[in-house]
Amino acid sequence: MTIDGTGQSKEALQDERLNTGSDKVYQNYMMPALELYDAKVSINHWQLRDCIKPGSMNQSKLYYIYDHSIRVLDTDSSVLRSPVRRHNSIQPSNSGKNSTEKTSTKGSRTTGSYISKNLHVPSEKLVEFNFKPRCFTELNGLTVCGGLIGSDDKGFPSNWNRLAQDANISLPPPSQPINISKNISFPINSHYSNPNIWKGIVEFYNQETDTMMTFTLGQFINNCVTLYDRASMQFDLFACNNDGHLYQCDVSNRDVTLVKRYADLKFPLNNASLSHDGQTMVVSGDSNKFAVYNQNELTNQFSLHYDNHPSWGSSVNRVRRIPRFALPDESEYIENIYEAPNSDHGFYNSFSENDLQFATVFQNGTCAIYDIRNMATPMAEISSTRPHSHNGAFRVCRFSYGLDDLLFISEHQGRVHVVDTRNYVNHQVIVIPDKVNMEYINERKHNTNHNFTTNNNNENESNDSKNELQGADYRSLSRRRFSLPSMPNVTTEPWITMAQRIPKKYLEPQILPFPKVMDKISNESVLFSTKGSSSSDVAHPYKRRCSFRVRRVSTSAPTADYSNNNVNASLGTPAADSIATSSSNSAPQNLIDPLILSHQQASNDVFEDDEYYEAYNDVHSTYRVSSDYHGVSARAFESFLRPPSTPDLPSDDDNFAANSRNNRGTSNFLRRPVITTQESNEFSEENNISGIDWVEDRNGSSLIIGTDYGIMRWNINSWARRSFSSYDLC
């Protein structure tokens, strides 16, 4: 039988293009939409970036660090996510202005009131400590923070005395020495033997009793605190200190007591991770070595002196033959201190759900995954996109649970890795958009107003300025375009980011295959190379989605205006989202110029048959000129802000939106990144990753990412992850 390959169907040809060669499709592990909460997360130590954690009793509640306090954000809102899953909320269309009006009228009835009413989730302050938390954890209502006594803390002796003098009262000491068990002995004539000069801090807060306690623990900073509940209201606390010691404390309703001091590793310790059953603990620090401890159930303490534990999956115990009359060699005992290849300083460890595998990450951009049953060599190694660099250093890693089978790893800035743990080969990278440098913008804010008015006297001057942009004056002119309207609650609510002032499409992250991001130093180079490669490849209508929708959620306190809007919305008055449903040329007053972030714009690289996303692009394909620049026409505004290589913009935004559907190449120039110059590097910088975590609640499993713009909650495509499709050729 002869098979004619020329008569293949259209679907077969498309499948062949998408699954072979450079057009291979990578499955999107994340859902097409995510929420961005404008909650500011503080990084109180530049290397410790595990500042966000889900609640142990309610994972929808996110605990995060802000300055001296711990704040709580409740992300459990079924009404908040319901409009996203209704695909008929925004109708696709194929016409121009009429389609936009249709979307505006229908969208206002279906989604306008819901969106404006529900995209507001205020955050709350849980507790404020006397010392800045550098790390923290929460378990069953007990919150513990670690740090040190710093000069910028309220509890610093001089600052504390000043507070007492200003209040004209006698304040109790901000901290007290921790109780030490009699079984602990310290080296004589050592600075560790005098707890009175310890500078490490551990702070406790009990939500049930609303009590707070602060103790000094360790000679230097405590880089990590870990809790394990042994019984009701009885915990084991493990604190990693820069003095090279791991401290184990007994926490109960009576007191906090130091019961054990581990000094096996002779370098500063950064992280201690416990398995879910509490039997195994991995400790790493400023070295490429890490220790794997095993718990003695009789003493409730950990030790490195053990051999082969039957509960780790091996039923055969190792037997050593010792010659008769020979003394046993103590050096033959397994110390369980391992050296990871191609690594330097360890910063985080994480166990999988079954406790059989764990991942440990290092500062040079290496992640080693080990099987606890065979520690000879790592079973897999994950590399950073920027190894041996500051912004590419690995900081935090997390395993997902259930059937998701994913490993998340955060870099120091800008990127989060998503690795398929079924084979450790499928590897994608989430690229977070760069942030605006507010300090740079504020320095030049006073040069903005008079420059806008002088550049719009007549059309001749507009054309002259367009020609001047070609020369050396473009750099000086470009400095005048950076201005941000003032945020109304910036002084009263400093825990709010500027995410509400940035257009949504410039907050959209991208997911790219690891080979496309490897060795790209900046995110601008990643996006620019992606656009260049996509234009050179053979175009086909089915492309993998790499840009994702962002739904901004305000975390500010409710105001009178917000309350009135809620009343109107509840009475049936439509309060439509001006960005999603309006067809006018004016935008909200709090938008900045999108072109200052044009290098961050994601490409329109999505499935053409995705009607929901197509309708979204039709509405958001053009930016709106802000009406708060009085006396400036849209044409002059656009020509002034346009880089010299950018073609003229159409004067009618709605016509441009209609043309963009018929000619994708015309609309993509707004989505192409501008080549980086020294000037652009001054007003934009990479987003700091303040933490990642995995949560699962009634809304599904989600990835939590902390950025400078706020906290992202991104649902995982769990239905797609439940497919174990494979085939063999016989």
UniProtKB/Swiss-Prot annotation:
Source organism per UniProt: Saccharomyces cerevisiae (strain ATCC 204508 / S288c)
Sequence ranges of Polar residues compositional bias: 89-98
PTM sites of type Phosphoserine: S82, S89, S483, S651
Record's keyword terms, sorted: Phosphoprotein
Keyword Phosphoprotein: yes
Region (Disordered): 82-114, 447-468
Low complexity bias locations: 449-460
InterPro entries attached to this UniProt entry: DUF2415, Quino_amine_DH_bsu, WD40/YVTN_repeat-like_dom_sf
Stated name of the protein: Uncharacterized protein YLR149C
